[in-house]
UniProtKB/Swiss-Prot annotation:
This is FAD-dependent urate hydroxylase. Pathway: Purine metabolism; urate degradation. InterPro entries: FAD-bd, FAD-dep_Monooxygenase_BioMet, FAD/NAD-bd_sf, HpxO. One of its GO terms (biological process) is urate catabolic process.
């Protein structure tokens, strides 16, 4: 089939690679003139890694991934370790090591694998309509194209989603701002092989290793939306928000490069049931935009890619039937993880002070099993289990 994908993010690229593996002719159209990753890095948990392994990318993703052997929570104000444990039991349980990876490097790898010659930049879709067994897509430059299937991988502001649902879905602000970037690994920040998270006051500062001796860092602060966003003031702003925190966090803020640091107001969307309409189907954030609090946004987009490609391959009654079966497989799991991330977000960022304070106390008693079981419950249920 001739498949058009709108959006060249992780979901669109992974879907394109998967569909090409099954012999489809696939073209990706991206509205941006230049591909720029949203965020510095991503924690790619084992279910997402397995999806890339399935597509033959196991060596490539292993080269990009950091060596994350341990996990720790640290009191952000005192610097006291609350809990620290090995992730090896988790890795053995699910059968695959997780890989924190640079978003830019992951996106470049996926673009190379898909084929850059089939990615068209600066093409913004403005309208679509279905005609018999085809979909007509119109672009802002006046051009149009026909496809047998249209995959909407156009993110949290998806135009394709508006078409599928018949209405626009507004994003929900999650209540916190996230600053993220990359810094060199250094022992005065955190151990090199550990995901370390400093917590306190409903805020957090987190570091996880990616390839080439770098930490991916992020700092979260509960704030109202719409505040000033001036890169030149990032350091002094963060120093103000994290005043009185331990030396490791102060050192992180001092070392970050404001011009290479991203600031994101974190949002999600209310889960919905309809992932397709006729021959138009949604994947990734267009279908189930989530907060990053359980690290499953990119992983779920990759699961979508595998399920969609397989459903179109093995179900031969009709394209619509294959898309319906894709929806039935993906809807419950993806939407459940959106709500699970939302719940985790509220606890982490002190929506209820008593609940978050109780969580801090639980962390001091944690031996690792409870946290790992929670992560495992997010990982299992992927299409390759």
């Amino acid at each position: 089939m001739n498949v058009v994908i709108i959006g060249a993010g992780m979901g669109g690229l992974t879907t394109g690679i998967a569909l090409k593996k099954f012999g489809h002719q696939v073209t990706i159209f991206e509205q941006a003139e230049q591909i720029l990753p949203v965020g510095a890095a991503i924690s790619l948990w084992s279910n997402g890694v397995k999806c890339l392994n399935y597509l033959g990318l196991n060596e490539q993703i292993a080269k990009l991934g950091g060596q994350m052997d341990n996990l720790a929570y640290v009191d952000g104000l005192t610097g006291d370790v609350m809990t620290e444990f090995s992730l090896q039991p988790l890795i053995e349980e699910v059968g695959q090591r997780p890989y924190p990876v640079s978003r830019a490097e992951l996106q470049n790898m996926l673009m190379d694998e898909f084929g850059r010659e089939d990615i068209h930049l600066g093409k913004r879709m403005v309208a679509l309509q279905q005609k018999d067994d085809q979909v007509e897509i119109e672009f802002a430059d006046g051009s149009s194209i026909l496809a047998d299937v249209l995959v909407g991988a156009d993110g949290t502001h998806s135009i394709t989603r508006t078409y599928v649902l018949g209405e626009k879905v507004e994003r929900r602000y999650a209540g916190y701002v996230n600053w993220n970037g990359l810094v060199d690994i250094s022992s005065d920040l955190a151990p090199a092989d550990q995901w370390t998270t400093y917590v306190g006051e409903g805020k957090r500062a987190s570091l996880m290793p990616v390839a080439d001796n770098r930490f991916y860092f992020f700092l979260d602060v509960p704030l109202e939306a719409g505040l000033e966003n001036d890169k030149c003031k990032y350091k002094e702003t963060l120093q103000s928000y994290f005043k009185g925190w331990c030396p490791q966090v102060q050192t992180l803020i001092e070392r970050l490069d404001p011009q290479k640091t991203n600031r994101v107001e974190i949002c999600d969307i209310e889960p919905f049931a309809q992932f397709y309409k006729g021959r138009v189907v949604l994947v990734g954030d267009a279908a189930h935009s989530t907060t990053p609090d359980i690290g499953q946004g990119g992983c779920q987009a990759m699961e979508d890619a595998i399920y969609l490609a397989r459903s179109l391959q093995i179900n031969t009654l009709s394209v619509e039937d294959a898309l319906r079966r894709y929806q039935e497989k993906r809807n419950q799991r993806a939407n459940e993880l959106v709500l699970r991330a939302r719940k985790r977000c509220d606890v982490t960022h002190m929506k209820d002070e008593a609940v978050t304070t109780a969580w801090y106390a639980e962390l001091r008693q944690e031996k690792g099993l409870h946290i790992m079981n929670g992560i495992i419950s997010n990982i299992v249920g992927n299409p390759l289990d």
